[in-house]
From Swiss-Prot:
Protein's recorded name: Phosphoserine aminotransferase
Gene: serC
Record keywords: Amino-acid biosynthesis, Aminotransferase, Cytoplasm, Pyridoxal phosphate, Pyridoxine biosynthesis, Serine biosynthesis, Transferase
Binding site for L-glutamate: 42
N6-(pyridoxal phosphate)lysine sites (modified residues): 196
Amino acid sequence: MEKVYNFCAGPAMIPAEVLKKVQEELVNWNGLGTSVMEISHRSKEFLAVAKQSEKDLRELLSIPSNYHVLFCHGGARGQFAAVPMNLLGDANTADYMDGGYWAHSAIAEAKKYCSPNAVDITCEREGKKAILPAREWSLSDDAAFVHFCPNETIDGIEIRDLPETDKPIVADLSSTILSRPIDVSKYGVIYAGAQKNIGPAGLTIVIVRDDLLGKAKQEIPSIFDYTVLVDKESMFNTPPTFAWYLAGEVFKWLKELGGLEAMKQRNDAKAELLYNFIDGSNFYNNDVHVDNRSFMNAPFQLKKPELDSKFLEQADAAGLKALKGHRVVGGMRASIYNAMPIEGVQALVDFMRQFEQKNA
């Protein structure tokens, strides 16, 4: 079988080593004679999976003991609603930093529950898309929390700093979680859809500080109430067990590779390889300022956009899949999450070089 590299923004690549292990034990997991998909979420076998996966995630992220880890349904869009319903308390506003498509989507959802202070933090620097430094963000005094999306997957824009504030910081880390070390103690809530760096779609991770529990609005659906989910240990209803199990296998894989510092070095090398090639080319362009380029999602444009379809068709034939940019911005996009090996990025660069030579 021809080697295929999947550059999809999500659902994204899952580590080949993990997929192989899952395949081998799919129909007879742990000698039970059944699949892990078929066992009760309350069985001792699955409870052991749940306990170990949380333990491994806590170790990877160095999560302090005063934070709870939840394994939920609903994706990041579910959290767009859950966050204000859980954290507003008696307040009627929260600060929402608008850095792109996903932040804007969170703001639109928040308007159902409060009057968000939406702050446009985008700017232009040296003719490129950029983000204002966090010290220049306009925060309000009466906000219940500060929400932002550190990595906008569509535009390929990443925010690298945090604001100085005494309000809880809430971050949508769907596309960057586990890609490098972070200081969890600087956040009030972290949430992430699983389908980029954690595992298959259907699972959502929420990390919430203990003092933020108990503020939920009375009308909040129980399935979104952080306090209920903490009390029930993420098993208020049947959780996405297969996605949870597979996430646990990804956590083990990350630990075997050396943890998040090792993953950071791996991801830095991939991004450097791709961006250096684009910057050295007169045929391709990236329109994001170097200070805010995403390490996970690298959009690029051909100087001859009429060749886009040809590029995508030939790339696909070469085993380089899902490189089409988001419909909002067009062009191309290479999502190079944790599971993408540097060999995949090298294969992409080699193809891009050959395509340029033939079509410049």
